[in-house]
């Protein structure tokens, strides 16, 4: 007997609040990605405590970020903000000599209306170091959108595309330095003659190399990445340049690239999981008139290598509470692995930027013959917990605040922040995603095998108890 599956995606919006990790945490991975940068977070002691605890980096390690702590004098306007920030930036230039200083605005600077954008142009002219201002406050932005605001601001500083299509800056430079044929050039890949392609999104260097290699196999050359490892290496942007994102939380950056820099956006699913990576490449290739090759076989090999994990997750259920805006991509991948997704909570949803990802989610659900999960934007945690009590999922992917309470109620949990910091992009890293997902499932199965599944408190001490046979 065949059953008809609803093929429409249901969107809902609840309270309008952001129950997420603080967006200033983007400093933790961006300062490592942009090697010659320095991040100055302008906020209160609370922001400082958060960075100290969340990043786990001690001050004496001299990381390339710092706190400009606001005091009562700053808030009551008794102190000159410009002079205070100037003193700090001069000290940063002297001690660390960065190529760029990035000010990160917080909730406090937003509330007291501190004019960081007005001060930065004058100050960067005085000290001779570029200063970018990114508002990453938790009032307006969710967890990973902190990176989005930084990249959107950085896109404004990218140079204009100067070289004719088909002739790169690297080619012209090599011709000037070596006016004779290079023997090594014979070993290089013959790239197709296509317009410049810039990929935006912060990924570790090894992931950048992996995705570059995947596109190189299709004879596509990546002209640059935003952000680059060094500020001076920011890619050239302009009319005729194609851009494509690797993360679903970069809608503001995409809008800036389209409207301000006149780039052409390639709307594609995101390269998370073998299915997403294949779809990402298949969306890029036709834009340049190239037919994708050998992707189906490559994807099948990856799925075959994941068989041990797939046997463990098949038929298990998962509930996304919403935190890092990776929820749609992760849900699509887990559905393809055979899991059942009850609900996808997400802090913010840009349907235009994630259109291709949503289409792939729908196609995946139809292929796996399961209902399309409903998507709840800005979910109310109380309502979610009520729904979880009814559904009893095997796993909840949630923020840190809810992990222990849910675990105490017998629901396996995984911190969503772990997916943010893990390497989950590309063909080769699908195993890492499943390792994160299956860890709590394996732990619960081991407890079941021991018949020790509950905690009992006696005289202020906890003991594991064996359920009474019925």
From Swiss-Prot:
Q: Name one GO cellular component term.
A: chloroplast
Protein's UniProt keywords contain Nucleotide-binding = yes
Q: What is its EC number?
A: 1.3.7.7
Primary site of residence: plastid
Q: Which GO terms describe its molecular function?
A: 4 iron, 4 sulfur cluster binding; ATP binding; metal ion binding; oxidoreductase activity, acting on iron-sulfur proteins as donors; oxidoreductase activity, acting on the CH-CH group of donors, iron-sulfur protein as acceptor
Residues recorded as binding [4Fe-4S] cluster, renumbered to this chain, are: 22, 47, 107
Q: Which UniProt keywords apply?
A: 4Fe-4S, ATP-binding, Chlorophyll biosynthesis, Chloroplast, Iron, Iron-sulfur, Metal-binding, Nucleotide-binding, Oxidoreductase, Photosynthesis, Plastid
Q: Spell out the CDD domains in the cross-references.
A: Pchlide_reductase_N
- Report the subcellular localization: Plastid, Chloroplast
Functional summary from the UniProt entry: Component of the dark-operative protochlorophyllide reductase (DPOR) that uses Mg-ATP and reduced ferredoxin to reduce ring D of protochlorophyllide (Pchlide) to form chlorophyllide a (Chlide). This reaction is light-independent. The NB-protein (ChlN-ChlB) is the catalytic component of the complex.
Which family, according to the similarity comment? Belongs to the BchN/ChlN family.
Instruction: Name it.
Output: Light-independent protochlorophyllide reductase subunit N
What is the organism field in this record? Pinus koraiensis (Korean pine)
